Regions:
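Conserved class I S-adenosyl-L-methionine
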Residues: 58-67
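Glycine-rich SAM-binding Motif I of class I
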Residues: 69-73
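Nucleic-acid modification enzymes, centered on SAM-dependent nucleic-acid methyltransferases
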Residues: 3-57, 77-78, 83-196
Length: 196
């Protein structure tokens, strides 16, 4: 225990004033980081800095509130084993998709299977508060189809679910007002919870 304490003390003396993460570009890091927005997310440079200061390659890094998986992904990118835990189903999907991604070929194959197997589902049972967010002629039936077909238990499907969550919950429009997202933009003050 004494050796562990002295190691931690030695590492805490390491350049605390040299917070390089503060000066990293906003979009710095692995291409999976911006997969989906998430409340209370932090820039990837923060976990990277602390992972490199307090762990060695091969160590296990556990994030008990993984959110969108920033710290576990940074751990993996840094040669550590990244593990994330979170009660949120969205957080689970995002973290799992980032730390255990499928191959590009398996993703493309699954997309092809979904495209070929598409049959327009009945959307009459979709609640009005959900229906109002999507184009009922095209987008809503496709989302219902994907909800019915994709499983969070399969690696490829988790990756597609995580990617779709980002597309569904984005809010960026370019100068021509073309959106690459499938829902209307909502501020963080809007809640889908009943009676909010």
């Amino acid at each position: 225990m004494e050796a562990l304490t002295s190691t931690i003390e030695e590492r805490t003396k390491l350049r605390w004033d040299d917070n390089n993460w503060k000066h990293l570009p906003k979009r710095w890091g692995h291409s999976f980081h911006p997969m989906c927005s998430y409340l209370a997310m932090f820039p990837p440079g923060i976990p990277r800095y602390f992972i490199e200061q307090f762990t060695e390659p091969g160590d296990i890094v556990l994030d008990p509130f993984s959110g969108r998986g920033t710290a576990p992904l940074e751990a993996c990118v840094s040669g550590r084993v990244g593990i994330g835990i979170d009660l949120s189903p969205l957080a689970h999907i995002l973290t799992a998709a980032k730390v255990d991604p499928p191959s590009l070929n398996s993703v493309l194959k699954r997309i092809d299977e979904l495209r070929i197997g598409y049959k327009r589902p009945n959307v009459d049972d979709v609640p009005d508060d959900i229906r109002m967010l999507f184009d009922g002629r095209l987008t809503l039936p496709q989302i219902v189809y994907l909800r019915n077909e994709l499983s969070h238990r399969k690696r490829v499907d988790r990756f597609l679910l995580a990617s779709l969550a980002g597309i569904l919950h984005g809010g960026y429009n370019d100068a021509m007002n073309n959106s690459s997202y499938l829902s209307i933009s909502m501020p963080n003050t809007f809640s889908m919870s009943p009676n909010y």
